Amino acid sequence: MQIRRRPNPVVAVQELRFQVKAPDATPRNILEEIVWHKEVEVEQMRERAPLLELRKQVQTAPPPRDFVAALRQAQYQPALIAEVKKASPSKGVLREEFDPVAIAQAYATAGAACLSVLTDEKFFQGSFTYLNQIRQAVHLPLLCKEFIIYPYQMYLARSQGADAVLLIAAILSDQDLQYFLKIATSLGMAALIEVHTLTELDRVLNLEGVSLVGINNRNLENFTVDLQTTCDLLSKRWDQLDQRNILVVSESGLYQAVDLQQVQTAGAKAVLIGESLVKKAADDRFSHETDRMQAKISALYS
């Protein structure tokens, strides 16, 4: 998958307006649309909070928690990264009455090893404010689930309490992946590098300093899901991953115990689950969030 960057903006010079026309000025898929919007969004973020200001906040922030160690020492196996997620482009709003802190606290009580917090506003109705609020409320390591295309976003994530960041191979060059890995390390954060294809996995295996790889069972071009993605990639590259002690996380499409067993048998040491936990069943009988999450997570590991 090759994700293009946003076409050059129109530049006004006195009475004239110039733009280098792109061959195709509309996004080809949802992932490309997200990336193009993210470029504009980050420009606006920089105006509100300059990088220099974020660097100062990072310097005075509490030290990050060890995300990878938490997965290796988890109560459940495969270790659970439970996601705080209100909506998605494919499923729309997952829950109308959405309290991110209550959900995060319920996950922690129910045995999650780490949490993932969506921060994209336009497409997932997430927020960096949610990340900060959850950091104040729970002790677990936090993954900032963001479409990172600039180092600025990594500093913002750390300033708001993130212990790990997501790097998506499909939207970053090899050079950017390696550079962003170094930035994450310098900030004390783990980097979960997400892949969907064998080509992307091979690119990641050529990088230095990789400790976490996420295999997304969802095709981000069309949002179809196939658990066999995790199984196929691990069957082809298990030896290289194992030799380097890289912990593999299976992401998306995990709804029941048999799904977890399938990816664990293939070699995944952790799973990232959001939709099936956040979404309420039609016959939901729980009055407390903690009871609901304990029941759901217990069922996944039964």
Swiss-Prot record:
GO biological process, one term: L-tryptophan biosynthetic process
Short name of any one Pfam family annotated for the protein: IGPS
EC category name: lyase
Keyword Lyase: yes
GO molecular function, one term: phosphoribosylanthranilate isomerase activity
Pathway the protein contributes to: Amino-acid biosynthesis; L-tryptophan biosynthesis; L-tryptophan from chorismate: step 4/5
E.C. number: 4.1.1.48
Keywords from the UniProt entry: Amino-acid biosynthesis, Aromatic amino acid biosynthesis, Decarboxylase, Lyase, Tryptophan biosynthesis
Domain of life: Bacteria
Keyword Ligase listed: no
Database matches in InterPro entries: Aldolase_TIM, Indole-3-glycerol_P_synth, Indole-3-glycerol_P_synth_dom, Indole-3-GlycerolPSynthase_CS, RibuloseP-bd_barrel
Similarity remark: Belongs to the TrpC family.
Protein name: Indole-3-glycerol phosphate synthase
